[in-house]
């Protein structure tokens, strides 16, 4: 399973990482909103770390204009906690 963590001002998801300062406001999704974001609403230009069987999802826009990914879409059993950890990392920079 891909590892997702927030540490030292960075967000790690699977094999990739990004400085939290390059990310916008994270949005935690569950239920129908998460299903839509994983399905018909999925942004093909985003970096995806999506695991089947996990309802929660965090979508974070990338604010670095040089980054080809427009957002990060990350599965999480605790999307509120992941979004809060990203916000804390952004505030510490």
For each predicted feature, which ranges?
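Transmembrane-cytosolic junction motif
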Residues: 1-10
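Cytosol-/stroma-facing membrane-proximal "stalk/adaptor" domains immediately downstream
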Residues: 70-93
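Non-transmembrane, membrane-adjacent beta-strand/coil modules in membrane-associated proteins
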Residues: 12-73
């Amino acid at each position: 399973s891909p590892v997702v963590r927030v540490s030292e001002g960075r967000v790690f998801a699977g094999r990739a990482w990004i400085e939290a300062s390059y990310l916008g406001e994270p949005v935690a999704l569950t239920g129908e909103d998460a299903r839509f974001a994983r399905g018909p609403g999925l942004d093909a230009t985003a970096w995806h770390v999506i695991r089947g069987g996990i309802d929660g999802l965090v979508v974070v826009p990338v604010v670095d204009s040089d980054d080809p990914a427009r957002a990060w879409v990350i599965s999480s059993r605790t999307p509120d906690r992941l979004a809060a950890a990203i916000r804390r990392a952004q505030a510490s920079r």
